[in-house]
Amino acid sequence: MNIDEMLNVLNKKSGVQGVSGVSSDFRDLENAHKEGNERAGLAVDMFNYGVKKYIGAYAAAMGGVDAIVFTGGIGEHDAIARAKVCHHMDWLGIRIDTEKNEHPVGDVCDITAWGAKVRTLVIATDEELMIARDTKEVLEK
């Protein structure tokens, strides 16, 4: 295996795709799991568990958190993933409103449950706008 093939395996065929044997697209994984593919369910559970571990680790390192922000493909578009990541996070002050989570509205949507100590937000990603802003900044230097 040459270096390009190795990078392809590490970057494209490992992680959730490697565990599931299906895909790295969470929509495909959720559909496969609904159809009985236990490996797809395991891959999703492992991913969500990893996100929880990172939240807990960073909360410990920072002495707590003020907000959790979900963005990008999975964070922005997958209510099930957000719910699973936030499940059992009450100890940290994270609780989400089920209805708001399942139907986020606007580019910035607060899905925090009433009484939660940590705000939980879903923020739309606009990568093209960020690239344009960064390009403008570089060109103006």
Label each residue range with its predicted role.
Residues 41-61, 65, 69, 75-141:
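Internal helix-turn-beta structural module
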Residues 3-4, 22-26, 82, 132:
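Alpha-helix initiation and N-capping motif
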Residues 22, 32-33, 90-93:
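Short, surface-exposed linear patches
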Residues 1-12:
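A conserved active-site cap/scaffold subdomain adjacent to cofactor or substrate pockets
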Residues 8, 15-19, 26-61:
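Adenine-nucleotide phosphate-binding core of ATP-dependent small-molecule kinases
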Residues 14, 74:
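Glycine-rich beta-alpha junction loops
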